[in-house]
């Protein structure tokens, strides 16, 4: 259960940072 959340977070966080900082 926890690893699935961690994998999803690791996938989503870069996208959020990308959209906030506009640095992809």
Curated annotation (Swiss-Prot):
It is found in: Secreted. Expressed by the skin glands. The keyword Secreted applies. The keyword Cytoplasm does not apply. GO terms for cellular component: extracellular region. Shows antibacterial activity against representative Gram-negative and Gram-positive bacterial species, and a very high hemolytic activity. Belongs to the frog skin active peptide (FSAP) family. Brevinin subfamily. This is Brevinin-1Ea. The lineage of its organism: Eukaryota, Metazoa, Chordata, Craniata, Vertebrata.
């Amino acid at each position: 259960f926890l690893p699935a959340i961690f994998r999803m977070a690791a996938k989503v966080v870069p996208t959020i940072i990308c959209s906030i900082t506009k640095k992809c």
